[in-house]
Amino acid sequence: MHVKKGDTVQVMSGKDKGKQGVILKAMPSKNRVVVEGVNVMKKHAKPSQANPQGGILEIEAPIHVSNVMPLDPKTGKPTRVGFKVVDGKKVRVAKSGESLDK
């Protein structure tokens, strides 16, 4: 996958097109990611030990990884991801040449 947990991304298509957020969870086996504040669904929860009140919760549902693009650290715009080998490690690189991995 071209994105990882903690990356700042922009949604490129769907009902939340244009929104930006941080990836909270990545699911490579399903090709899906959960982005903060994107694809928010309402879930009905029964009262439990963790949530004694119960009620309606708003949670982020996963979206397909093809619908998001990471933001370039240099320009702040969505960018495609390339890969380079630096010191024997495969590193993700934005098209501007800036490294996406910390």
UniProtKB/Swiss-Prot annotation:
Gene Ontology biological process terms, A to Z: translation
Molecular-function GO terms, alphabetical: rRNA binding; structural constituent of ribosome
GO cellular component: ribonucleoprotein complex; ribosome
Keyword annotations: Ribonucleoprotein, Ribosomal protein, RNA-binding, rRNA-binding
Listed PROSITE patterns: RIBOSOMAL_L24
InterPro entries, per database record: KOW (IPR005824), Rib_uL2_dom2 (IPR014722), Ribosomal_uL24 (IPR003256), Ribosomal_uL24_CS (IPR005825), Ribosomal_uL24_KOW (IPR041988), Translation_prot_SH3-like_sf (IPR008991)
Pfam families: KOW, ribosomal_L24
Stretches the record annotates as Disordered: 1-22
Main function: One of two assembly initiator proteins, it binds directly to the 5'-end of the 23S rRNA, where it nucleates assembly of the 50S subunit.
The protein's assembly and partners: Part of the 50S ribosomal subunit.
Family from the record: Belongs to the universal ribosomal protein uL24 family.
Entry protein name: Large ribosomal subunit protein uL24
Species whose genome carries this gene: Exiguobacterium sp. (strain ATCC BAA-1283 / AT1b)
